[in-house]
Curated annotation (Swiss-Prot):
This is Glutamyl-tRNA(Gln) amidotransferase subunit C, mitochondrial. One of its GO terms (cellular component) is mitochondrion. Belongs to the GatC family. It catalyses: L-glutamyl-tRNA(Gln) + L-glutamine + ATP + H2O = L-glutaminyl-tRNA(Gln) + L-glutamate + ADP + phosphate + H(+). The lineage of its organism: Eukaryota, Metazoa, Ecdysozoa, Arthropoda, Hexapoda.
Length: 148
């Protein structure tokens, strides 16, 4: 009994830290980056100032393809605003902009060899699925039936 109490006391005593954790000042942590430190408000061209009209046939097609229900007014407004935003970003001029591979472009990226370390576990993984077809998972359909 005494041995057990000594172990408990030692564990409690040994896990207490006497060092205070330092607060990090994130403004001092700087890396060479092309990401601006302050938000940039870009003026998108207002190409779709007019209201977007969606006919019922297009809405039914989107519902069937995306497996979502667009019956509510809020869902239609979200869809229209998404279409307007997509229309705005398609008009951004990116002709002379080089592709950005990483945010920290001046740091060397350490890549590892792409080797398979574990494998041959297809049967084990597929055993967790309720329905499979030709070694593929079969996901349940959404809230809209596919047959129309």
């Amino acid at each position: 009994m005494l041995r057990l109490l000594n172990k408990r006391f030692y564990c409690k005593f040994a896990t207490k830290t006497k060092v205070r954790p330092e607060k990090l000042n994130f403004k001092q942590l700087t890396h060479p980056t092309k990401v601006p430190q302050t938000p940039v408000k870009a003026a998108f061209p207002n190409t779709s100032a007019n209201e977007i009209e969606l006919d019922p046939k297009s809405i039914q097609l989107l519902e069937r393809l995306a497996l979502v229900d667009l019956d509510s007014e809020r869902a239609l407004e979200t869809l229209k605003s998404s279409i307007q935003f997509a229309d705005k970003i398609t008009h951004i001029q990116t002709d002379n902009v080089r592709p950005l591979y990483t945010v920290l472009e001046q740091q060397q990226l350490q890549l590892r060899n792409d080797l398979v370390t574990e494998g041959d576990c297809r049967g084990k993984v597929l055993s967790n699925a309720k329905v499979t077809d030709e070694d593929y998972f079969v996901s349940p359909p959404g809230n809209i039936p596919l047959e129309q």
